[in-house]
């Protein structure tokens, strides 16, 4: 799972150790390494998710592609957020996705394009049987993004760090049925 993902508007780059090191150093280092424009505030996160991904990839190089990805807007060569997985599939074949889009580029369909690409990419791996995601426990733009990716709301949970969350999932064997319903709606 190391390949770059291409969509209509995005080039989605898997973060290896070198890219994660550049993220941790700063925007200029990342810009120089990838020859892209890196705007201030491109991520809503502090560096902890990238630090964690770095440590995991450092310990398990084969997991490149199961952590962070960087979506680059092709026509501007601009970093517009981040996304990826929270590790390789577990024993049951479950992976979790996460994504974010740079605030000035939200509400343009980029989050949906990124999330769909991640879902499609994960399901290319025969070990993946189900994909999960979590949102805040209220209707928001992320809920609609996940619905457009074929995900269904499953339950509300409480997380000690994040509070109330809604859980979403799409099992591989239901994906085509859900997608056809969405596209015909």
PLM regions: where:
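Glycine-rich acyl-CoA binding loop
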Residues: 107-112
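Conserved GNAT acetyl-CoA-binding A-motif
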Residues: 125-134
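Surface-exposed, gly/pro-biased binding rims or lids
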Residues: 149
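GNAT-family acyltransferases
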Residues: 1-96, 101-104, 117-121, 125, ...
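Conserved active-site tyrosine of GNAT-family acetyltransferases
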Residues: 146
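Conserved beta-strand-loop-alpha-helix junction that forms the acyl-donor binding cleft
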Residues: 133-143
